[in-house]
A protein has these predicted regions:
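Catalytic/RNA-binding core of pseudouridine synthases
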Residues: 1-191
Length: 195
């Protein structure tokens, strides 16, 4: 049985490092158009992954694009690594650390107990280096130009925030959360609560 991209398919992509979600959609759209010898096809993704994130990206084609909101509304689980003792303006590795914190008092129990405080409904402000739009413009575009923007908080739900490994200053974790959660903000807040 062949794939019918025009009627609609869901494609699961393991997004590579440094690719944007739009890069994946664009490349896939062009490949499908070329393979089927057509000029137009609907292709979209169910949730944005940061360029510096790797992992599952749900791509929908044709009539399946009508279900994108359904898929993007599902809970997500992220696995990552954070460095204790510093933060960056972008909350990730896109920018260099600009704030440093003392870490002598931080131990394994403090990290684990602090992570538990984030489980449940919380208010989170998306980072300025994000795909959130302000007046029709993506925040990351404004941030890269040095434009200061006030970002409103949003309610999100963290279902689990588990610390899987601690090798100071690096901490590995897994986090299961609702739509709209910015993982980089969550671990930046964790680091701030430890100080």
């Amino acid at each position: 049985m062949g794939l019918d991209f025009q009627t609609g398919e869901m494609i699961l992509i393991d997004k590579e490092l440094n690719w944007t979600s739009f890069d994946v959609v664009s490349k896939l759209r062009n490949s499908i158009k070329k393979k089927l010898n057509i000029k137009k096809i609907k292709v979209g993704h169910a949730g944005t992954l940061d360029p510096l994130a790797t992992g599952l990206l749900i791509i929908c084609t044709g009539k399946m694009t009508k279900r994108i909101n359904e898929f993007s509304g599902l809970n997500k689980t992220y696995v990552g690594k954070m460095t204790i003792g510093s933060t960056t303006p972008s909350y990730d590795l896109e920018t260099k650390p600009n704030v440093y914190y003392p870490t002598e008092h931080i131990n394994k129990n403090l990290i684990i107990e602090t992570a538990k405080k984030f489980v449940g409904k919380i208010e989170q402000k998306p980072p300025v280096f994000s795909a959130v739009k302000k007046d029709g413009v993506r925040l990351y575009k404004l941030a890269r130009k040095g434009v200061k923007v006030e970002v409103e908080k949003r309610e999100i739900i963290i279902h689990d925030f588990l610390i899987s490994s601690i090798n100071f200053p690096e901490v590995e974790f897994s986090l299961t959360c609702s739509k709209g959660t910015y993982i980089t903000v969550s671990y930046t807040h964790l680091r701030a609560h430890e100080t």
